[in-house]
Amino acid sequence: MSVTPERKSELISEYCLKKGDTGSSFVQCAILSERIRNLTEHLKIHKKDFHCRRGLMVLVCRRRNELQYIRRKYGNDRYLALVKQLGIRDVFH
């Protein structure tokens, strides 16, 4: 359910804004999206894991807040590019 260190370093290198950037909103959003995908796969198998389902809802809210921040700070074009790159729906249009 968590992201492996190898996968996390791949995500960091793919979404970083500059070398050594591990905490930007783009990287955080990518890592949250990976965690959400992992939890979704877990919940397909374990349908009655309600504790995990609540954790999924918390992660979705955190990602939505990060996406709102990216849209507000960096503009709509970079936001839409990130949404397309992550393969998620645009919730604000």
From Swiss-Prot:
GO terms, biological process: translation
A Pfam family reported for this protein in Swiss-Prot or TrEMBL: Ribosomal_S15
Record keywords, A-Z: Ribonucleoprotein, Ribosomal protein, RNA-binding, rRNA-binding
CDD domains: Ribosomal_S15p_S13e
Ribosomal protein among keywords: yes
Ribonucleoprotein listed as a keyword: yes
GO molecular function terms listed in the Swiss-Prot or TrEMBL record: rRNA binding; structural constituent of ribosome
Function: One of the primary rRNA binding proteins, it binds directly to 16S rRNA where it helps nucleate assembly of the platform of the 30S subunit by binding and bridging several RNA helices of the 16S rRNA.
Family statement: Belongs to the universal ribosomal protein uS15 family.
Official protein name in the record: Small ribosomal subunit protein uS15
